[in-house]
Amino acid sequence: MGSLPLILLSLLLPGALANVYSCAGSVKSTSPVDYSQLKLQVRLLTLEGHMKHEEEVNPSNGYFMIPVYNKGHYTLKVSAPAGYYFEPDSIEIKIDGKTDACSLNEDLVFHLTGFSVRGTVDGAAAGLPLVLTENGKQIAETKTEDGGKYEMRAPPGKYEVSTGAGASECISKGKTSVEVKNAPVVVTPNFKISGYQLEVHTRTESMNPFVDAVMTLYATSSIDLPNIKCVGSEGSLNVPSTHNVKCSIGKTDPRGRLSVACVPSGEYYLAASHVNGPKSINFSPNPQKVVVSQAASEARFVAQSATGRVRVTSKDLPLSGVEVLVNEKSGGKTDSQGYLKIENLKEDEHTTITAKAPNTQFSTVHANVKFPKVEIQDVTVQKFDICGQVEKSENGVLGKLTFTRKDDKRSLEIQPKADGSFCQPVSPGLFTIEPTDKTSSLTPRLLEVEVLKNAVTNLRFTHFKTNANVHLSCIGACPTATVSLFLPGQTLVRSVKGTDVFTFENIGPGTYSARLDDNGRGCWEKSEMTLVVEQSNTQPTIHFKQNGFAAQIEISHPAEIEWSNADKKQLNGKTSTKGGEVISICVPTSGVYDVSLGSCYKFERQQFKLTVPFDGVHKEKAVAARISGTIDLENDKNAAVSIRIKSSAGDREIQVPALDNGRFTFEEPLASSGEQLVIVPSSKLRLFEPTSKSVTVTGKCIENAVKFNSFRGIFLDGSIKPAVEKAVVKAVLKKDKDVVIEAISNKDGAFKIGPVKRVEDYDITATLDGFKFTPTSTPGHFQSVKLSQLSIKVVDEVTNAPLDGVLLSLVGGKGAGSDYRSNNVLDETAHKNYVALAPGEYFVRAILQEYKFSPSTSTIVVKEGQHENVVLKGKRVSFSAYGKMREMSGDAMKDVIIEALSEGCDLHQSEATTKEDGTYRIRGLLPDCEYQVHAKSYADGSPAPHSFPRSFTVSMTAEDVKGLEFMATITAKTTDIAVEIGMDTLPEIQSVRVVITKNNNDHVQVASVVAPQHLHYLVNLPRDGVEYAIRVEAEKPPQAFAAKTVRVVADQAMKVARVPLTSSKRANDVDISVGTFLSLPFFVTLALVFFNQNRVLELLGTFIDWARNTFAPTADNHHRKRK
């Protein structure tokens, strides 16, 4: 049996000392919660869920502290009455004695984040969704259970409970308000079902969903539904007059559906519609009767036809009064905007649309109907007729006419009919018409004809001609001007240049418009007049009269323009410009005028002289824009406020006039557009809100760009009582922690802070070593306390012997030390001294495994400057089990976890780790409980070694149990290395030397490998992670290959190292080449068996003996009992 440990060998790890670790923290809440009434507990659980320890939180501040005696994985959870919720729900801890929160004395914090909101919906089945909302935002959701019961969780606040999305039923009033403060809430009274869901479906005849159908519900009375507005109605087609309330309930979604919740029981009429401007869809059946009663209802609509409209245009201009043909039948006439409504359009049907008008040809379009889309292109004019009459000459000849398009200069020659009439269809546009024969006496000689909105049918070319005269009446000499003559429709006949008299020769009869253009030099009573030419011997004459002189001015930005005659100031006037435009100013006489610009912009010249008349355009350009702001000075005449303007060009300062109640202005160059300015007000007496503001320069004037409020600052006279000198007092602005005001108290404890706006805006603190300062109800005033001392000793109540290893927790309660907290493990003296304590109430708790202290928490009152002495006594209430684990050889086994588990005592569990000498002590075992004690695992989590016996059954009494000794069988962990040498690549090599070292220098082995053998083995090496260097070199000169070295780490059961050989003369180390045992499945296994024949036979025999002992009935499960 001496070979048994070779089969069951396990990993040995260093042992851990039995230290005690403090897992401390607090249960915090933003709402005032009475922990003493709740009796909150924090539980320490193993990963299997076994409870290791349970501790009540401090009733004053929620603090807790739990001792942990063994390293390992644990879970902390808060145990509380139903309806209280904490985050996190649990905290996972791996105690390693170094890096975990408990070992580092870091706080473990649970936050009481919410409470239950529960209630009942009478008459509701299970599955009704409910939501909890705050200001419209969803906080929680749930579904009712059997009986209509529900429960949600929420932090303190004011909420509303209502049905959630997908609910087919609604509760009474739709929602109810609840307020969560510091405890679970029961919603009363119970909800009742008040309505049901209405489902609407819309589709096309081709079974596709119809989107955005508008649904209107007609009822006999107004219904109270969220987000639905009901108004009185005079009824609708096919809706009974009794249903005179109209409610818009929404639109269908992309699936063609609309769900309306909470519709009360009753009889309704539902109508569907879809209107997109002039386009609409007709549904069937529409409307339809809907009865809501005891369950969700539904209505279905089918989109059957559409109504659209067509527009008739010519060159994008609307044509009114035009008859429209739909499928060759009259559909009506267009309105003033060229539109006509077309009804009963079917989806996917072929519908043609065109128009009809005299002397006009139109395009034909097709209606494209694909619900809900209805598209009809404009019907456009293709041809207009130009018609007229040509008078015969004296010898009876009818002259031809030439039509020329103005846009592309294409021309067409027209021959009138025998009666002189002509009618030519042309595409819309502008044309010139003139006699083809340049020597012909036909007039007019040239006509400009516009055919954009209608045909032209009244043109007349005649051989009659006469002259027309235009006279100018000027102030002084008339300037050179141009008079143009137009026919109706803006057809230019002729333009004539001159000064005071303009003659238009050889023009035909008709009504003309004469327009005067003098290049803007003069002002005229009329610049356009009507000229009528009749077929008579009298030459028509008209007169244009000048009433002033004009000057052209262009100002770059908006401004008011004022002018006055330099010699006669009574001749003055004003006008305005929006900037960037050329305007004319009219003055009564010529001469020199003074012009000034009034604007928020600064110009290159704000005033200038202008000589009238003036050829050309006078221009002025703005160079800066005004920015203004205000500071509310509260009518303070002595404010002495200045403004600092910070920019990339530097800082500049301006004074704020107090008489204008804080209004200030400054000018910023237009070139600074896009720059950010920072405006900072300052004063020795006043404070400002905000302290600064930014303005972006836009290149435009900015009125009231910034506004500051100001107020006189106040100074706080603070105090410390009893007086403490040289205390440091800091006032930190709550909104900006960088704003700090400091002061030092004098010998009377007085100090001054300021100027400030409101003391309440600052957090004020006082500090000095050896003192504690508590703010009073009056800001800036403190109560000072000289700190005190407390000594605590912990002893056994029977023997009065000091109890070392006690975890002592001291927590502040009421008074100046309410935020104090300290945890300490007592040494062999069992004594702890606390210094510099603030006077007040403290809670002290002593914790030692197997001991109970009564009361569990003691209250100690520490008085100012006093030294308090306290003795705590503990009574032993649980006991230990002692034992040892050793190998069959007698060697101690360390770092094995021994566990004691009691199924009969609520799965109470405790464990310990074996020490260097293999001993262990399992603490905290309860009397009258029966435990199973067994090896659980190694401390690193690897499986425990096999032991004899497998377990002990221990019935605990009020005494320790000793002598629980385990004998373990272990298997040593080793590594075998197979070295494969690439000798086949160099057949001339007959033998090589293998040199093996570790840790770079330590010699391990030197061996020769002779061909044809090319494998070498190292067996039973310790699996300890050591790196081995394997060097293969030529055994005899001459050297046919360069020596090779590979490195292997002993960290697995089997490692294979390959060493390739080449004829290269260069020395070279190669990288690790490591495979697994499977890479050489046959020859490596065979070689191992060959080289270890005795060991294999011994292992096989040991395994057979072990199997017989294990499966034969034996008494290896010993029972130990102490009474």
Curated annotation (Swiss-Prot):
Q: What is this protein called?
A: Nicotinic receptor-associated protein 4
The region annotated as signal peptide is: 1-18
Q: Which residues lie on this side of the membrane: Lumenal?
A: 19-1071
- What does the record give as the function of this protein? Involved in the recognition and selection of protein complexes to exit the endoplasmic reticulum (ER). In muscles, regulates levamisole-sensitive nicotinic acetylcholine receptor (L-AChR) subunit composition, possibly by allowing only specific L-AChR subunit combinations to exit the ER. Specifically, may promote the inclusion of alpha subunit unc-38 into and the exclusion of unc-29 from L-AChR. Regulates L-AChR sensitivity to agonists such as nicotine and levamisole at neuro-muscular junctions.
Write down the InterPro entries for this protein, in alphabetical order: NOMO-like_N, NOMO1-like_9th, NOMO_7th, SDr/BOS_complex
- List the GO cellular component terms: endoplasmic reticulum; endoplasmic reticulum membrane
Q: Where are the transmembrane segments?
A: 1072-1092
Q: Identify the species of origin.
A: Caenorhabditis elegans
Which keywords fit this entry according to its UniProt record?
Endoplasmic reticulum, Membrane, Signal, Transmembrane, Transmembrane helix
Q: Which residues lie on this side of the membrane: Cytoplasmic?
A: 1093-1123
The protein's topology relative to the membrane is: Single-pass type I membrane protein
Pfam families tied to this protein: Ig_NOMO, NOMO1-like_1st, NOMO1-like_9th
Compartmental location: Endoplasmic reticulum membrane
How does the annotation summarize its subunit structure? May interact with nra-2 in the ER.
Report, as the record phrases it, the tissue specificity of this protein. Answer: Expressed in body wall, pharyngeal, uterine and vulval muscles, motor neurons, nerve ring, motor and ventral cord neurons, hypodermal cells in the tail, vulval epithelium and intestine.
Query: What superkingdom heads the lineage?
Result: Eukaryota
From the UniProt record, report the name of the gene that encodes this protein: nra-4
